[in-house]
């Protein structure tokens, strides 16, 4: 009955329509994902019967009214979402969705990367892209019995990050560092990467890798179809580490993964515990990886953290920040504050 169906694109700024979408998602046991930039809705006889959204290169919030399931509408909606993403210059697409929608997106050319059985699947619109990416990593492979890996945000890069890298590199024949690639953090990705490259230039046997979509960002991980936070965290950990262990680690020959101890964030502390299971469990058909926790570097009896640096930056307290970060980071933060002051002064001078 597609002839009477109306497909509409809805921006986040359209409050009335967004309220209708939120209600429809709620009726389908979903919620609005805050990262979605634009939705496509399907209405029939002025009633909302389906919707889906685009967040960057990720398809999210797909819901089909139970009354119209089986009509083929889902396939049409998925095609419209893919076309919209392409128009927005996103051609490398992912979807995190309920297990029940896996077959639907297979019909649209998506392939399953990994899954949390019975809960969710992660798919992309290629059957070979992840394998090609893993293959491309092999040129960075180095010989040795102990090959380490660190994954970090460095938001911003601190003396604590540098200490972890130094300690891990000293224990390994080679160390690989991946920087999580997302710009929803306080500092742009390219800035964070530049600080890490400059701040580790003197550390031997280290390769700093640009992040990729296959190093999963917690910031972009969807939670709109999972109600319990503990289940969200579990799914994130399982998805992230299955991809790492099955594809990325074998390409580089990684035998050990290093993390800092986590005294502050309960979620990260639990992630470290769960990481040990997913890196070592024999249920995954990939070589096990040993998790190594390194005690966090302290300053005046307190572990150094990026969150503490961000708190101090909000207070413009560069004096307190100075002993917590490398010189390259301090210089960057000084420039950041100076530009903020100049922008504020310029706004004050601009007539209303």
UniProtKB/Swiss-Prot annotation:
The catalytic activity, as recorded, is: holo-[citrate lyase ACP] + acetate + ATP = acetyl-[citrate lyase ACP] + AMP + diphosphate
Expression triggers:
Repressed by H-NS. Part of the citCDEFXG operon.
Going by the UniProt record, its keywords in alphabetical order are: ATP-binding, Ligase, Nucleotide-binding
Which stretches make up the N-acetyltransferase domain?
A: 1-128
User: What PROSITE patterns would the database entry show?
Assistant: GNAT
Q: Does the keyword Nucleotide-binding apply?
A: yes
- Region forming the signal peptide: none
The molecular function GO annotations come to:
[citrate (pro-3S)-lyase] ligase activity; acyltransferase activity, transferring groups other than amino-acyl groups; ATP binding
State the top-level EC class.
Answer: ligase
Annotated GO biological process: biosynthetic process
Return the InterPro entries for the record: Acyl_CoA_acyltransferase, Citrate_lyase_ligase, Citrate_lyase_ligase_C, Cyt_trans-like, GNAT_dom, Rossmann-like_a/b/a_fold
Q: Could you tell me the EC number(s) of this protein? A: 6.2.1.22
Keyword Ligase in the entry? The reply is yes
Q: What does this protein do?
A: Acetylation of prosthetic group (2-(5''-phosphoribosyl)-3'-dephosphocoenzyme-A) of the gamma subunit of citrate lyase.
- Name assigned to this protein: [Citrate [pro-3S]-lyase] ligase
Q: What taxonomic classification does the UniProt entry list for its organism?
A: Bacteria, Pseudomonadati, Pseudomonadota, Gammaproteobacteria, Enterobacterales
